[in-house]
C-alpha cells in the first residue's frame, strides 16, 4: 500500500509543479520584445545573429526589372561598421531560412521566431507592386513554406518602403489564395517603413484592405541621430481604442543608451547590429521586471495590454 501512496504523492507533486509553472507563465505581465538582427543577408549570418541573442532577423530583398525577388542584398551605403555587400540568391536564402526555422531540422534555431523582409521596391514602378507581391508569395510558398508541407514556422513581416506600393499586399494575398494556401496569411504581417505620417500609413492600409497584423517601424541608419517623437506617436496609436497599429519597432539601435530610450518609449521590437547589447539592457535591474525576450508563444500580431 505504501508504494502506491508514494507514487500518488510523486505524481501529485509533478502535476502541481507543472500547473504552477503554467500559471506563472500566463501571469507574466512583462512586455515581450523582439530583438531584430539587422541586415541578415547571408545564410551564415542567421546563426551568427541568433547566437548573439536575436529572436528575429531583418533581411533585404531586391527585385529585378520584371518584379521578381532576386537577391537578399542591401548594397552601399548601409549602417556604419557593417559590410554592405553580403548576399544570397533569394530562393537559396529562403531554403536556408526554412532549415533554421523548421523543428527537427539539424540546423533548427528554436529562438528564431520572426523575419522582417525589407522589400527594396524602390527599383519598381508603382504599377509593378501587385505583380511583385504575387511573385514574392510564389517564392515563399515554394521555397520557405515548402508548399504548405512542414515548411518554416517563423512569422513573416512584409516591410514596404513606399505607401504607393500598397497593392503588393493584395497581390501577395491573392496569390496565396489562388495557390490554395490562404491560411498562410495567418503567419504574415505588414509594415510601411518610409517614416511617413502615421495618418498616411493608416490610409494606405485602408486602401489595401488591411486591418490587423500591423507592425510600425521608425528609425534611421546608425550613422545618424533620430529622436523618438514619431515612435511615441506610433505607440500612442497602438495603445488607443481605435488605433490600427499592433506593434512598434525602432531601428537601428546599437547603443545601450538608445536601447533604454526605446524601451522607455514602449516599443515592442528593437532592430540592431548588436543583439547582445539589447540582451544586456533587458537584463538590467530597471528593465528585467518590465520586459522579456519574446518566444514563439507570443503572438506578434497581438497588441500587448499592460
Curated annotation (Swiss-Prot):
Keywords: Cytolysis, Dermonecrotic toxin, Disulfide bond, Glycoprotein, Hemolysis, Lipid degradation, Lipid metabolism, Lyase, Magnesium, Metal-binding, Secreted, Signal, Toxin, Zymogen. It comes from the Eukaryota. Binds 1 Mg(2+) ion per subunit. The active site is at 38, 74 (nucleophile). Expressed by the venom gland. GO terms for molecular function: lyase activity; metal ion binding; phosphoric diester hydrolase activity; toxin activity. Its EC number is 4.6.1.-. Residues 19-26 form a propeptide. Glycans are attached at residue 283. It catalyses: an N-(acyl)-sphingosylphosphocholine = an N-(acyl)-sphingosyl-1,3-cyclic phosphate + choline; an N-(acyl)-sphingosylphosphoethanolamine = an N-(acyl)-sphingosyl-1,3-cyclic phosphate + ethanolamine; a 1-acyl-sn-glycero-3-phosphocholine = a 1-acyl-sn-glycero-2,3-cyclic phosphate + choline; a 1-acyl-sn-glycero-3-phosphoethanolamine = a 1-acyl-sn-glycero-2,3-cyclic phosphate + ethanolamine. Residues 1-18 form the signal peptide. One of its GO terms (cellular component) is extracellular region. Mg(2+) binds at residues 58, 60, 118. GO terms for biological process: killing of cells of another organism; lipid catabolic process. Disulfide bonds join 78-84, 80-223. It is found in: Secreted. It is an enzyme of class 4 (lyase). The keyword Lyase applies. Its cofactor is Mg(2+). Belongs to the arthropod phospholipase D family. Class II subfamily. Class IIa sub-subfamily. This is Dermonecrotic toxin LiSicTox-alphaIA2ai.
Amino acid at each position: 500500500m505504501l508504494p502506491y501512496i508514494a507514487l500518488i504523492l510523486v505524481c501529485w507533486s509533478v502535476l502541481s509543479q507543472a500547473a504552477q509553472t503554467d500559471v506563472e507563465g500566463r501571469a507574466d505581465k512583462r512586455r515581450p520584445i523582439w530583438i531584430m538582427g539587422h541586415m541578415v543577408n547571408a545564410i551564415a549570418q542567421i546563426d551568427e545573429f541568433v547566437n548573439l541573442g536575436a529572436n528575429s532577423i531583418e533581411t533585404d530583398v531586391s527585385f529585378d526589372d520584371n518584379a521578381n525577388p532576386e537577391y537578399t542584398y542591401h548594397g552601399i551605403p548601409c549602417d556604419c561598421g557593417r559590410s554592405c555587400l553580403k548576399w544570397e540568391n533569394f530562393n537559396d536564402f529562403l531554403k536556408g531560412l526554412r532549415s533554421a526555422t523548421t523543428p527537427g531540422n539539424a540546423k533548427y534555431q528554436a529562438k528564431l521566431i520572426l523575419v522582417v523582409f525589407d522589400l527594396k521596391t524602390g527599383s519598381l514602378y508603382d504599377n509593378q507592386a501587385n505583380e511583385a507581391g504575387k511573385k514574392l508569395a510564389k517564392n515563399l510558398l515554394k521555397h520557405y513554406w515548402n508548399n504548405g508541407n512542414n515548411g518554416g514556422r517563423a512569422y513573416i513581416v512584409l516591410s514596404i518602403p513606399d505607401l504607393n506600393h500598397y497593392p503588393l499586399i493584395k497581390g501577395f494575398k491573392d496569390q496565396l489564395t489562388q495557390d490554395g494556401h490562404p491560411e498562410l496569411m495567418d503567419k504574415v504581417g505588414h509594415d510601411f517603413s518610409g517614416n511617413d505620417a502615421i495618418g498616411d500609413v493608416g490610409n494606405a492600409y485602408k486602401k489595401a484592405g488591411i486591418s490587423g497584423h500591423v507592425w510600425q517601424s521608425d528609425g534611421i541608419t546608425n550613422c545618424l541621430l533620430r529622436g523618438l517623437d514619431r515612435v511615441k506617436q506610433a505607440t500612442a496609436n497602438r495603445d488607443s481604442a481605435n488605433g490600427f497599429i499592433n506593434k512598434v519597432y525602432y531601428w537601428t539601435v546599437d547603443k545601450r543608451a538608445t536601447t533604454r530610450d526605446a524601451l522607455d518609449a514602449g516599443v515592442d521590437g528593437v532592430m540592431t547590429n548588436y543583439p547582445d547589447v539589447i540582451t544586456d539592457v533587458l537584463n538590467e535591474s530597471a528593465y528585467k521586471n518590465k520586459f522579456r525576450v519574446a518566444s514563439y508563444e507570443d503572438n506578434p500580431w497581438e497588441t500587448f495590454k499592460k
